[in-house]
């Protein structure tokens, strides 16, 4: 229960291995949905088709034989909208409430379904009275799709935040550390859209929000809610969350790995508060992206490959590019046995990032660390810490 009249009817998915076919979710996922029980009954979003039958059972138990009046679709992504057509077929008096942009998307997902007379489009500032509850709609375009909206219930002071404030993990596996998987979720799902997240945070700042009901992860209240809003403000401004240095390396036969690990040792010996060393070939890419946003400094170390850079490093830097990654300091280590090329490629990709600084010197090693290379790493460490 969210409140006496707002019920949780969502489902956990413990069978899923990759969320959006790319993010590992060892703790599963939740697809959150809520029912507001008033003079008019509103269902807030549906669920992923993967768990459709469980969701239907939860809905029907909450309805207890009654008919819902409204289905509010905050977000058209299929993990939340898959059962819209089933709802409209099952409850002939039901109206679908969504943004105009969402209404345009309906035929993309439900070919041939007749939505005529069944859709109520709403925009920024519109309200929907359910009786004692009144929903006010808030535009949240590109957080993280263009049709997204949020809604605010003025009675119970609840913000239904769509994918905002979501996290990886099923609710049955929830821990007290909300930030860990919320951070990985935010930077990989919404990381590109910091400006849009800031716009929404400014819109809701004047509201008395006592509860946040996201589409993934736990309902937030009290201190966890305040902490989540503070983190979202930091994250969406692209500010480092904490001091630290990420060393991300791409090594073929181990030589680059040795150099990366050695740089980490040198940095720690010189007083670096936090140094994280990640093997891009074996680490969860989403977690490395998370760390890149979390800390102010990143070192990329990679082997040369086919006249360019080892592919996993290219993939990492490409991920940063598409997330509009800004305002960080970079160090570069390249490795090449006969014609080092990795540094040039990495340098070029980093130059394409907004307001990012490349720290000198760029370190070049030949196949394996030599005693003479130690001085290069020492110099780079000094520059990174200065």
Give the role of each language-model region.
Residues 171-212, 216-219, 262-278, 288-386:
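FMN-binding flavodoxin-like domain, especially the glycine-rich phosphate-binding loop
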Residues 144, 148, 164-192, 235-241:
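Active-site-proximal loop/helix segment associated with metal-binding centers of metalloenzymes
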Residues 2-60, 150-153, 157-161, 256:
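Conserved beta-strand hairpin/beta-sheet module of binuclear metal-dependent hydrolase folds
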Residues 50-97:
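Active-site metal-binding motif and surrounding structural segment of the metallo-beta-lactamase
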Residues 83, 283-288:
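Short acidic active-site motifs
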Residues 1-4, 98-148, 193-201:
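Metallo-beta-lactamase
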Residues 217-242:
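Terminal amphipathic helices with adjacent charged low-complexity linkers/tails
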Residues 44-46, 68-76, 96-99, 159-163, ...:
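Active-site neighborhood of phospho(di)ester-bond hydrolases with catalytic His/Asp-centered motifs
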């Amino acid at each position: 229960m969210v409140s006496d009249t707002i019920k949780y009817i969502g489902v956990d998915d413990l069978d899923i291995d990759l969320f959006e076919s790319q993010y590992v979710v060892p703790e599963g996922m939740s697809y959150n949905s809520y029912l507001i029980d008033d003079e008019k009954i509103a269902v807030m979003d549906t669920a992923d088709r993967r768990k459709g039958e469980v969701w239907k059972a939860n809905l029907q138990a909450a309805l207890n034989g009654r008919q819902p009046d409204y289905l509010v679709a905050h977000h058209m992504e299929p993990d939340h909208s898959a059962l819209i057509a089933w709802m409209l077929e099952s409850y002939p008096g039901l109206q679908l409430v969504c943004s105009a942009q969402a209404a345009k998307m309906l035929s993309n997902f439900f070919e041939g379904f007749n939505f005529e007379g069944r859709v109520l489009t709403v925009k920024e500032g519109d309200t929907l009275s359910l009786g004692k509850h009144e929903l006010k709609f808030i535009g949240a375009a590109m957080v993280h799709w263009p049709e997204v909206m949020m809604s605010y219930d003025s009675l119970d002071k609840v913000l239904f935040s769509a994918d905002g404030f979501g996290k990886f993990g099923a609710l049955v596996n929830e821990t007290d550390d909300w930030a860990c998987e919320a951070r990985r979720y935010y930077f990989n799902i919404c990381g590109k859209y910091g400006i849009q997240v800031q716009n929404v945070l400014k819109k809701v700042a004047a509201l008395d929000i006592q509860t946040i009901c996201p589409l993934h992860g736990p309902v937030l209240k009290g201190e966890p809610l305040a902490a989540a809003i503070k983190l979202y403000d930091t994250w969406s401004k692209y500010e480092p969350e904490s001091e630290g240095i990420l060393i991300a390396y791409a090594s073929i036969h181990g030589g680059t790995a040795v150099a990366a690990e050695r740089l980490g040792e040198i940095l720690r010996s010189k007083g670096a508060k936090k140094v994280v060393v990640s093997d891009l070939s074996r680490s969860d890419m989403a977690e490395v992206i998370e760390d890149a946003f979390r800390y102010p400094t990143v070192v990329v170390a990679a082997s040369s490959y086919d006249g360019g850079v080892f592919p996993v490093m290219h993939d990492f830097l490409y991920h940063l590019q598409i997330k509009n990654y800004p305002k960080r300091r970079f160090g570069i280590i390249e490795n090449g046995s006969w014609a080092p090329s990795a540094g040039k490629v990495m340098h070029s990709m980093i130059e394409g990032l907004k307001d990012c600084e490349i720290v000198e010197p760029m370190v070049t090693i030949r196949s394996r660390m030599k005693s003479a290379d130690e001085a290069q790493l020492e110099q780079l460490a000094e520059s990174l810490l200065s």
